[in-house]
Amino acid sequence: MYDNLKNLGIQHPEDIDRYTLRQEANNDILKIYFRKDKGEFFAKSVKFKYPRQRKTISDTQSGQGFKEVNEINTNLRYVIEELDQICQQDQVEVDLKHKILDDLRHLEHVVANKIAEIEADLEKLTRR
């Protein structure tokens, strides 16, 4: 699993936290950030540079015949697919954690209101 990331020398893809991708001139720059260990101030990161692929395609709209376009490197596309799998999986886990915490807060509120209601009923009974 995650063969493309392992080919880049990333032995533990599960430690990846996030990534950024930007374009500089005719290159795409991929920066991968790893989770921080306790006591570390900065997250470890690695940077990779991919040249953009140049393709000549027919241009029927301008009537010129052909034009050159730059595209993302095919290998980089595969690496990004793997990174998205890892990073989106983390997002789903975070979303689930937030949902559970929200449900817990709501339950606390409902229970507190019910306790107050029961105490009020008890107070009415003791005043009689």
Swiss-Prot record:
Disulfide bonds: none annotated. InterPro entries: UPF0325. Coiled coil: none annotated. It comes from the Bacteria. It holds the Pfam family DUF3461. HAMAP family: UPF0325 (MF_01519). Belongs to the UPF0325 family. This is UPF0325 protein PMI2289.
